[in-house]
């Protein structure tokens, strides 16, 4: 087996050579530079009268002959589409299916959810302009590297792995017959142009790439597990066949067909083998409550299935029949559209035997198949849909009457709301007090749209004739910016009394793309509506996101039953869902999980809103006396939820489109063709109102699209809006009300048949663990009917095909558990992304990609393939960042204006793929080739060179470790370019007393400036907060980043000079100045039986770690220093998004750790941190006297990924088992050491080396160096002392400031 670093580097080298033919890419150099040429700037400047000696055509001819060089660096073109696949052809059937499904534009249904494959014709009609407009939005791939690079990668990989995946065959056939499918920009990946053949080619290519990757992945996984086929029970199944039948069926209309098939595939995995007898489970034991997370896994065992008779009941037959019908529907639809005769033979055969075919969790052939069926669905990418803007259907709403439960469910919702407020108050969570009104608004300062718009001015910093006064106005709707600039106007009479129910005053819908499912609508509710909501619902949000508890139905507190927010998220699925694994292995547990369809739209004023508001009003009664800018809480509730605020509001979304003929349109009166204030999409003509449109609409033979422009197609909505501040909690409370009624009904109609042991509600997900005391089919059918009947009487819909009532199988928030094991579903996209990625910090971004890949591998992706993909991304991400940069004689500079030699040339920097494995501190991305979840720190690098088993893997890395140039990082750029002409008016209301004191007194300000507070010193903090918000606004970002380019050139120029200094005489030898903080000695071997764990579908590199180290036993982590700081910072509502633990650590690193509590409180309050939080922080930081550079170790992100969090590392138990250390170390120092040892233990496990105990000795050298640092830090102490006196709250000026709100 060739080392992955050698094989991968060679593979990516070939990809680069395929993408840029003629490049000389040396695998032993840190980066490779080439130029690209574009004649765009020359054309523009020639219009302005610039004369060039050489014509652009001549330069381009010379480039295509590969003769063009600039300052010794070659100028190259990227490969043309037709050569990407070397002209291979496959005559694949799938390609014909796609071509057959292409429709002419006359077939268009303008409001179809997903665009079908429409032909690109020669003459562009208005209708086609509309299709293209939709395609440019809905076919987006985004992602982080161009799709053509993916195609080169897939081609190279298929040469290595053959046979050739179907996706690649289809692409090769396409470029062979039609040449280029579309054009995509390299710098801006959202730039799609020149569609050829059909408007869906980008989606086709994304699908083909994804299909190929899934084929490679399953082949490589099977090779790792050493199996030749997957198995359904004992029947052999070919996974590639399964994937290909699904892929071909989807081609005619991918997202639509996938959407129909999604449910049957998931349902199949959940129900596979639940009726098999005997049945194999992974036995485990745990605490008393059914939601207990302390689970111990024991062993696999076979037991008789006492439920086997149940599966003949009509509920199960009906359930399977509905899923079979869905498949039939998808097959017929696909066959008609693509005129083919393919079905899903393999899957249909499996579906017939789903209940009784056994699922063997201990056989990887079964486990991989289950996981594979869940991840197949990612091939069609994100569901970017055209969401119709429809009003609430009032006549369909269930009104309260004695025969239904609408009133009961509303009353229960009211009672649960009241109870929630009582429980929250017991935990000291109360509503926002009037004096905290403005400060609390900052909780809403997220980077999402707000429904308001604001103006900000930014300095322009680039151009041939630049004056100082060039300010560019930027309009933004981002919440954070709106709050900073207009926060003081949100809570005024005028805003609070606006009613959003007219054509003049309405609100706007946003949307979120989710993989596979259709687009979700998001209501971006106006800020002046959100603030009153925040005042009353804040205690509930806080209480439920912090509190856990018992989930037994007879237990009166609801805190544990509503699971919201971070409460269960330790960051690792395997830990969070421990209760699912344990319950799915327990023969006594029967699980009921109800799936509501369209939950939000069924939350009407009858069954929900009335009860919710009554509950809130009654809970607010004790606070009658409070006044918010003069308003009572009664009024506040009305401003947050009343008529025209949330109830009965008008929303602007997509226009309603109608088909008509151009003749009919021309014959309209001029007044009827009037343009109102609402814009129509491209290629659509305006008419005055919906009535006019309806009058001339035709169904057949249309040639024109029209839409109303007077707002008569706004949607009137009265149901619950996702986007309200209380969405998740309100949903869960109402859900609990339905759940309670279900329990009552079942208990009344079928007494003693079903005992409810646990209830859990998350939004619209309901999960009951119950005990079933019968296997009588007729009785069971009655119980099922009773449940569906109750749901219907509450005014909701539950679908039998998706609702699960089963033993041995549990699904909770997308985590599937079967027979005690975890069936991971890997739905994380690799190629596409939800939105356009503007990568500001390349290093940070690739690091996060490594984290994503670790999560993918922990969900069954192949470890080697993950590394290859990461190396591909390492090489190309950030390659096209430099604009107008020229490299001349090893110096980087901007190109000259209007220069014959330089205009139109741009430098491209292609990194060495092995930079992935170089430590972050040396400009790499810090992954480790032996196992991705190990972070390659500088220490780890030194240790890895010493391990002989790693010699072959480390050899290629050693050659380039010193040669990686700095990464692009705009966030480090200069923030002074930002002049918000709107000086943060709101900041004065938000700033805390210490900061206000500093801002108002120059003497204090001068002293403060000498402290190392960086971006967070009082003078800069408002600008820092604005800047981080502005970076989310693309128009502003372009202006800010152009200034960063010069700084990046400086960094490159500075870096070249440093190499010789930074390393010893010979490259790769690290000089002695790099000494360790402590010495580690390996002592006796530890032995133990291999561990059992629920996530069996892992690549060997991860599997072996888990087997040797074992799963983490409890969800209680030994909180590291950094986590603890983050927890404390989270209590500061204003600054928590802006200041992170790393910010604090950086300040402390410069200040030193041995200051008194009081001194540190002063420093923190100057960073606008609330006094209470500052005190807690200071106390925590001084309680841990750190005696050497432990902080350096704590900032590397070790053990922070999803997989490592499920291992038994860095816990107290781990420290006791593996470490022997001097008793005088503090907890933080032990933390630092345990992180270092964690990495060593994981590395040794991944390499298959035996487990050993480690002995730690702190070196004298480290103690000496610490003493020297102390001297250096003492210099800051006097300044802080003086400052403390100056901003002492007892001085009059500050006191006046503090009283201004009273």
Swiss-Prot record:
It catalyses: RNA(n) + a ribonucleoside 5'-triphosphate = RNA(n+1) + diphosphate. This is RNA-directed RNA polymerase. It is an enzyme of class 2 (transferase). Transmembrane segments: none annotated. One of its GO terms (molecular function) is nucleotide binding. One of its GO terms (biological process) is DNA-templated transcription. Keywords: Nucleotide-binding, Nucleotidyltransferase, RNA-directed RNA polymerase, Transferase, Viral RNA replication.
């Amino acid at each position: 087996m060739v080392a992955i670093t050698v094989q991968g580097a060679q593979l990516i080298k070939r990809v680069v050579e395929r993408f840029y033919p003629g490049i000389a890419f040396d695998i032993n150099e840190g980066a490779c530079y080439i130029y690209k040429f574009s004649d765009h700037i020359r054309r523009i400047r020639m219009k302005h009268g610039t004369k060039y000696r050489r014509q652009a055509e001549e330069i381009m001819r010379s480039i295509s002959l590969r003769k063009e060089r600039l300052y010794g660096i070659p100028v190259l073109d990227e490969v043309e589409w037709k050569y990407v696949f070397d002209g291979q052809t496959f005559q694949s059937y799938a390609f014909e299916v796609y071509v057959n499904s292409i429709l002419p534009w006359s077939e268009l249904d303008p409001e179809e959810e997903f665009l079908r494959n429409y032909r690109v014709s020669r003459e562009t009609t208005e209708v086609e302009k509309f299709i293209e407009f939709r395609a440019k939005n809905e076919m987006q791939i985004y992602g982080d590297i161009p799709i053509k690079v993916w195609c080169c990668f897939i081609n190279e990989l298929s040469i290595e792995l053959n046979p050739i995946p179907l996706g690649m065959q289809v692409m090769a056939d396409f470029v062979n017959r039609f040449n280029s499918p579309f054009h995509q920009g390299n710098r801006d990946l959202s730039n799609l142009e020149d569609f050829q053949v059909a408007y869906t080619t980008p989606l086709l290519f994304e699908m083909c790439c994804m299909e190929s990757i899934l084929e490679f992945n399953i082949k490589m996984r099977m090779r790792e597990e050493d199996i030749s086929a997957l198995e359904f029970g004992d029947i052999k199944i070919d996974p590639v066949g399964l994937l290909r039948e699904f892929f071909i069926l989807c081609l005619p209309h991918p997202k639509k067909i996938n959407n129909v098939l999604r449910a049957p595939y998931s349902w199949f995995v959940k129900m596979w083998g639940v009726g098999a007898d005997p049945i194999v489970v992974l036995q485990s034991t745990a605490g008393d409550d059914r939601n207990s997370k302390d689970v111990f896994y024991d062993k696999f065992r076979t037991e008789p299935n006492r439920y086997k008779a149940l599966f003949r009941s009509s509920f199960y037959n009906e359930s399977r029949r509905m899923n079979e019908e869905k498949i039939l529907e998808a097959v017929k639809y696909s066959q008609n559209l693509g005129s083919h005769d393919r079905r899903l033979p393999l899957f249909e055969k499996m579906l017939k035997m789903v209940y009784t075919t056994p699922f063997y969790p201990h056989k990887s052939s079964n486990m991989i198949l289950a996981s594979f069926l869940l991840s197949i669905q990612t091939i069609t990418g994100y569901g970017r849909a055209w969401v119709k803007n429809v009003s609430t259907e009032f006549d369909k709403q269930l009104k309260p009457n004695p025969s239904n439960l609408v009133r009961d469910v509303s009353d229960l919702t009211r009672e649960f709301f009241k109870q929630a407020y009582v429980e929250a108050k017991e935990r000291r969570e109360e509503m926002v007090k009037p004096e905290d009104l403005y400060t609390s608004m900052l909780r809403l300062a997220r980077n999402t749209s707000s429904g308001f718009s604001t103006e900000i001015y930014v300095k322009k910093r680039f151009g041939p004739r630049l004056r100082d006064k060039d300010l560019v106005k930027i309009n933004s709707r981002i919440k954070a910016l709106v709050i900073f600039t207009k926060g003081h106007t949100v809570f005024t009479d005028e805003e609070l009394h606006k009613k959003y129910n007219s054509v003049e005053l309405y609100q706007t819908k946003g949307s979120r793309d989710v993989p596979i499912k259709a687009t979700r609508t998001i209501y971006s509710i106006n800020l002046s509506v959100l603030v009153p909501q925040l005042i009353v619902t804040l205690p509930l949000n806080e209480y439920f996101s912090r509190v856990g508890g018992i989930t037994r139905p007879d237990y009166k507190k609801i805190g544990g039953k509503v699971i919201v927010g971070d409460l269960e998220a330790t960051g690792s699925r395997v830990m969070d869902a421990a209760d699912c694994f344990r319950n799915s292995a327990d023969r006594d547990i029967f699980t009921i999980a109800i799936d509501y369809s369209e939950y939000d739209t069924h939350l009407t004023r009858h069954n929900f809103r009335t009860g919710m508001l009554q509950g809130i009003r009654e809970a607010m009664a004790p606070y009658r006396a409070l006044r918010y800018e003069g308003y009572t809480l009664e009024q506040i509730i009305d401003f947050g939820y009343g008529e025209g605020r949330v109830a009965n509001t008008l929303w602007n979304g997509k226009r309603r489109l109608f088909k008509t003929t151009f003749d009919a349109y021309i014959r309209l009166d001029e007044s009827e063709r009037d343009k109102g204030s609402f814009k129509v999409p491209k290629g659509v003509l305006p008419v005055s109102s919906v009535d006019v449109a309806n009058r001339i609409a035709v169904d057949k033979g249309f040639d024109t699209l029209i839409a109303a422009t007077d707002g008569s197609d706004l949607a009137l909505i009265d149901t619950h809006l996702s986007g309200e501040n209380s969405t998740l909690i309100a949903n869960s409370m109402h859900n609990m009300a339905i759940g309670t009624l279900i329990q009552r009904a079942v208990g009344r109609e079928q007494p003693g048949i079903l005992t409810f042991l646990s209830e859990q509600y998350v939004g619209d997900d309901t999960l009951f663990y119950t005990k079933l005391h019968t296997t009588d089919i007729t009785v069971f059918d009655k119980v099922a009917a009773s449940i569906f009947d109750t749901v219907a009487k509450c005014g909701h819909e539950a679908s039998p095909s998706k609702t699960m009532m089963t033993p041995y199988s549990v699904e909770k928030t997308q985590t599937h558990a079967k027979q005690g094991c975890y069936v991971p579903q890997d739905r994380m996209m690799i190629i596409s992304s939800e939105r356009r990625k503007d990568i500001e910090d390349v290093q940070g971004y690739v690091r996060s990609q490594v984290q994503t890949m670790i999560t993918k591998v922990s969900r069954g992706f192949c470890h080697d393939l993950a590394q290859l993909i990461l190396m591909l991304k390492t090489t190309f991400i950030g390659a096209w960042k430099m604009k107008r940069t020229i490299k001349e004689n090893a110096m980087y500079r901007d190109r000259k204006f209007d220069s014959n030699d330089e205009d139109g040339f741009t430098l491209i920097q292609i990194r060495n793929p092995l930079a992935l494995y170089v430590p972050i501190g040396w400009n790499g991305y810090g992954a480790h080739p032996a196992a991705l979840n190990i972070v390659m720190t500088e220490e780890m690098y030194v240790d890895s060179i010493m391990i002989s088993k790693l010699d072959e893997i480390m050899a290629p890395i050693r050659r380039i470790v010193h040669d990686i140039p700095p990464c692009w990082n705009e966030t480090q750029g200069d923030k002074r370019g930002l002049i918000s002409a709107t000086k943060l008016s709101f900041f004065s209301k938000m700033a805390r007393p210490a900061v206000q004191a500093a801002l108002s007194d120059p003497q204090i300000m001068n002293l403060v400036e000498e402290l190392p507070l960086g971006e967070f010193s009082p003078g800069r903090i408002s600008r820092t907060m604005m800047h981080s918000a502005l970076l989310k606004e693309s128009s502003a970002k372009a202006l800010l980043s152009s200034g960063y380019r010069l700084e990046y050139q400086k960094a490159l120029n500075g870096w070249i000079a440093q190499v010789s200094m930074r390393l010893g005489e010979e490259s790769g030898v690290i000089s002695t100045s790099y000494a360790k903080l402590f010495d580690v000695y390996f002592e006796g071997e530890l032995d133990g039986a291999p561990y059992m764990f629920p996530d069996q579908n892992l690549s060997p590199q991860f599997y072996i770690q888990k087997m040797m180290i074992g799963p983490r036993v409890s969800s209680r982590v030994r909180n590291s220093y950094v986590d603890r700081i983050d927890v404390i910072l989270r209590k500061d509502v204003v600054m928590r998004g802006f200041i992170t633990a790393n910010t604090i650590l950086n300040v402390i690193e410069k200040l030193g750790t041995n200051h008194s509590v009081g001194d540190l409180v002063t420093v923190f309050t100057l960073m606008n941190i609330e006094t209470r939080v500052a005190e807690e922080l200071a106390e925590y930081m001084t309680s841990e006297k750190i005696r050497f550079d432990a902080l350096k170790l704590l900032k590397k992100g070790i053990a922070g990924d999803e997989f490592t969090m499920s291992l038994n590392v860095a816990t107290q138990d781990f420290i006791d088992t593996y470490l022997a250390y001097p008793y005088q170390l503090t907890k933080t120092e032990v933390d630092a050491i345990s992180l270092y040892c964690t990495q060593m233990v994981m590395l040794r496990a991944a390499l298959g080396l035996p487990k050993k105990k480690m002995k730690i000795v702190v070196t004298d050298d480290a103690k000496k160096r610490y003493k020297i640092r102390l001297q250096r830090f003492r210099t800051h102490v006097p300044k802080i002392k003086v400052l403390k006196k100056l901003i002492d709250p007892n001085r009059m000026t500050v006191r006046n400031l503090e009283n201004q709100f009273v």
